[in-house]
């Protein structure tokens, strides 16, 4: 049955996101570059996979010196990707399949090729002279850190045309816009509207912490930046209800939550500090890195949601860890110097876990059940590999592997014409790892992800529930309870009458299919116990579940009844990197 778009304006709280690098997804016209029509061709696949919202990396016209994050013209789709009409068609076709689409929006900076910058640099008194930040010397704002430390020496760059320095937080070919100029604010708000008018469902806001600078500060998370975000949000709420703003703010939890404001800034923020700690926890085989950061994570304001991720198009960033933990991560995951990029590790998920299927499953099971909306990165559902011999972050941006045919089925262009070579090594190459093969193989990781997402979709507690970390005697075991009691069910909760929940469910029936069992009712679990073994060896665990005495425990994927909770001390054994999702009813 085709899915349709939910009308719930808070759809993003229960959605699963999928990040698409258009350039690398599917090439419809054989020029070696993925494009919007190619993505339209693959929507059926994404619908089958069960994702709810695509996040498109920047598609605007660009010299492509930073994957399109160097915008040359905000008003045009890059010719290699198609045209505005193609985007509108993509949005319509996706919506028809129940899939929403958000686009990356780079507000902080443009390319130095942008016509605004060309004008701005031409003299000190042209109409756009103050659209960027110009100074006679490069001594200003020394407290602001350099983000791309491995390639940039300063946040100031000399422009020989204007004979002045301009400010940039990323590459020197990406000058920062001057948000103290009200014309820049207005120009950006009209660009937002221009694209929302195509039917897009919102934006991932690139590099939001850096919009303003003030003397004596780090130039991050300033009150002026938050005021601008409130303005942006109110304009969107007024004209475009149901759209979402997802902030890319690589910050510590206490600064991060400020991007939700009082539910009047961004609807979502990526949880940057949690991500590296999931990798740390499985390597140390200890839950502490995860539980520590969750303890430091403030409550979400109403209507907000975390964006959770394992990998994305950038390096696995290590900005939000201590120096000691960064050394540990480099030693464990990035030993080869070619893997280090900026302040992180440019590798895909599968090579990071040494192609271990149980470990990839464990990490995804955590991703799908921790509080937030999961954001998948294209190709990770196949356990695709990377190519550390490519420059910058291209290691993780190679073509999607569709088939074992030429160019991995990504493009009919000559190999030499491809924007990047597809993987061809014996382990991760397209002949071994591709959608066609994994789709045919019911036991593949692709099918496992698809099934997990279908289970997750049936239980809104994963998107909406609170979390309580449980004390477990074994430090290698992470356990938490997710609970969600919608307003309408509070009467049931008060009387503690959960008995009816599983009525009619014949859990003893043995399924011969490899599929997880279908639920008899939708969204019935209001209390789910999630338990993970972070160690590569089998582990016992004892949980204090006294307050759930006499409740029924049912494994969620197979609907298999486990022993009821008796006097509180509940004993479980988990296989290597094993996990359970239990409903407690
Ligand atoms: C964050 C993006 O994710 C990254 O790819 C880009 O290089 C920087 N912002 C600069 O725009
Ligand atoms: Ca193309």
Model-identified regions with their sequence ranges:
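Active-site and adjacent substrate-binding regions of carbohydrate-active enzymes
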Residues: 1-492, 498, 502-585
């Amino acid at each position: 049955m085709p899915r349709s778009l939910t009308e719930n304006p808070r759809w993003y709280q229960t959605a699963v996101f999928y990040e698409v690098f258009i350039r690398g997804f599917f090439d419809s016209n054989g020029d070696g570059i993925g494009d919007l029509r190619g993505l339209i061709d693959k929507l059926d696949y994404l619908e089958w996979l069960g994702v709810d919202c695509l996040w498109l990396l920047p598609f605007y016209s660009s010299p492509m010196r930073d994957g399109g994050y160097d915008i040359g013209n905000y008003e045009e789709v890059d010719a290699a990707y198609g045209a505005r009409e193609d985007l509108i068609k993509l949005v319509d076709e996706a919506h028809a399949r129940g899939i929403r689409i958000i686009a990356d929006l780079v507000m902080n900076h443009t390319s130095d090729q942008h016509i605004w910058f060309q004008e701005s640099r031409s003299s000190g008194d042209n109409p756009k002279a103050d659209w960027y930040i110009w100074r006679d010397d490069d001594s200003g704002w020394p407290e602001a850190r350099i983000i791309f430390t491995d390639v940039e020496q300063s946040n100031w760059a000399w422009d020989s045309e204007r004979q002045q320095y301009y400010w940039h937080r990323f590459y020197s070919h990406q000058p920062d816009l001057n948000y103290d100029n009200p014309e820049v604010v207005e120009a950006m708000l009209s660009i937002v509207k221009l694209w929302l008018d195509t039917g897009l469902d919102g934006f991932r806001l690139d590099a939001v912490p850096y919009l303003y600078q003030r003397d004596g500060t780090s130039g991050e998370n300033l009150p002026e930046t938050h005021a601008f975000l409130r303005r942006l949000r109110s304009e969107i709420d007024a004209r475009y209800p149901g759209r979402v703003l997802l902030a890319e703010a690589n910050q510590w939890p206490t600064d991060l939550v400020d991007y939700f404001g009082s539910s009047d800034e961004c609807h979502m923020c990526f949880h940057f500090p949690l991500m590296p700690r999931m990798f740390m926890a499985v390597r140390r085989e200890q839950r502490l890195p995860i539980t520590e950061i969750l303890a430091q994570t403030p409550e979400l304001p109403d209507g907000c949601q975390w964006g959770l991720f394992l990998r994305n198009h950038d390096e696995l960033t290590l900005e939000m860890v201590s120096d000691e933990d960064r050394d540990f991560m480099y030693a464990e995951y990035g030993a080869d110097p070619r893997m280090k990029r900026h302040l992180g590790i440019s590798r895909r998920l599968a090579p990071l876990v040494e192609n271990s299927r149980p470990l990839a499953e464990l990490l995804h099971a955590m991703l799908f059940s921790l509080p937030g909306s999961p954001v998948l990165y294209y190709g990770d559902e196949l356990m695709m590999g990377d190519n550390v011999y490519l420059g910058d972050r291209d290691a993780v941006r190679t073509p999607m592997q569709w088939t074992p045919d030429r160019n991995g089925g990504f493009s009919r262009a000559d190999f030499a014409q491809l924007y990047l070579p597809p993987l061809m090594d014996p382990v991760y190459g397209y002949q071994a790892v591709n959608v066609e093969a994994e789709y045919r193989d019911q036991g593949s990781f692709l099918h496992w992800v698809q099934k997990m997402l279908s289970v997750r979709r049936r239980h809104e507690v994963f998107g909406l529930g609170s979390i309580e970390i449980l004390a477990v005697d074994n430090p290698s075991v992470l356990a938490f309870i997710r609970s969600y009691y919608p307003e309408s069910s509070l009467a049931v909760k008060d009387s503690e009458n959960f008995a009816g929940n599983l009525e009619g469910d014949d859990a003893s029936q043995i399924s011969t299919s490899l599929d997880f069992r279908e639920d008899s009712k939708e969204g019935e679990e209001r209390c789910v116990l999630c338990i993970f073994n972070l160690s590569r060896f089998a582990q016992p665990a004892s949980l204090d579940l006294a307050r759930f005495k006499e409740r029924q425990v049912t494994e969620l994927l197979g609907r298999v009844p486990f022993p009821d909770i008796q006097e509180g001390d509940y004993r479980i054994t988990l296989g290597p990197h094993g996990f359970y999702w239990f409903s407690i009813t």
